[in-house]
Amino acid sequence: MIGLSTYRNLPTLLTTTTVISTALRSKQLLRFTTTTSTKSRSSTSTAATTVGNSNPKSPIDEDNLEKPGTIPTKHKPFNIQTEVYNKAGIEANDDDKFLTKPTYRHEDFTEAGVYRVHVTHRPPRTIGDKISCYGTLFFRKCFDLVTGYAVPDPDKPDQYKGTRWEMTEEKWMTRCIFLESIAGVPGSVAGFVRHLHSLRMLTRDKAWIETLHDEAYNERMHLLTFIKIGKPSWFTRSIIYIGQGVFTNIFFLVYLMNPRYCHRFVGYLEEEAVRTYTHLIDELDDPNKLPDFQKLPIPNIAVQYWPELTPESSFKDLILRIRADEAKHREINHTFANLEQWQDRNPFALKIKDSDKPQPNYNLDVTRPQGWERKDLYL
């Protein structure tokens, strides 16, 4: 028989047995769960090393996966080059939040039209023309010397390879960003002066203001597109600050005294812009040059501004449109310099009906690269 003390301790024994049994069960479950989890990690690791890797036994080199950033280059202690974003960097930097439609709608350029643009030069005829022309060339030479820019001979495309004059992607972006930051000044300053003149004299401006503001807006869109592709250095930003402050005030004062000289100066400035972008297009046509530009996507802001561009368009397609814009600015400003500044209308703004003579327009179908002569226009 079981003693009375055994009956008294029976609940304790049952509880102890239950705890031990539960612990054993938990241990088995724990062992099962641990074994399953370990096996799962092993299979995941194997799958990860197999995908996109020719050798499944070697781990993935995550550094080779493109991350948002810039294209690696040789950094010097005193680095003043513009860094070019890689494909992922352009997509990450392509902020389209609150992106509004362009205020000034861009003209539809045909493919044949953008390829017809070529380098031209209007020979200076008057003293003002010579001052404007040689002044432009002087500033161009100074800028070329500072930035290490040179155009090789047509028969020697690799003439400057390996020297400080060789144009890399970083140097091209530095040049484009600086030039566009300055090119947006004349149109806005001239439009502002003419706006004040219209208010002060209580008279119409005859459509000059709209075209000048459109020009400034267009140049700023060039700049906004380029800064989505390249990240300017502190040196470039500093030069832009100084250059804008000096150039804006000088241009403003000269435009008050003689606007004709200013428009001729801008016409020659745009000639140099067309020359620069033509050089860039020639290098893009060479498969051995600028390899990083060959595979770059264009920013979304460019697709929305130029109606003929798509997300599949190349960097060369973008530069062709920008060069065409500069060619049109060249034509407009040389034409403006040929007109009576405060009396004649803007011939680009309105097409005269019932006329069989060629007339200026904002497109590329009828152009005069050296400007329209006043005697050939309906004013």
Curated annotation (Swiss-Prot):
Q: Which InterPro entries does the UniProt entry name for this protein? A: AOX, AOX_sf
What processes does the entry annotate via GO biological process terms? alternative respiration
Positions binding Fe cation 2 in this chain are: 219, 270, 326, 329
Please state what class of enzyme this protein is: oxidoreductase
Give the UniProt keywords, A-Z.
Electron transport, Iron, Membrane, Metal-binding, Mitochondrion, Mitochondrion inner membrane, Oxidoreductase, Respiratory chain, Transit peptide, Transmembrane, Transmembrane helix, Transport
Q: Where is this region: Disordered?
A: 33-76
Which EC numbers does the record give?
Answer: 1.-.-.-
Cofactor(s) needed, names only, are: Fe cation
Compartments annotated for it: namely: Mitochondrion inner membrane
Protein's name according to its UniProt entry: Alternative oxidase 1, mitochondrial
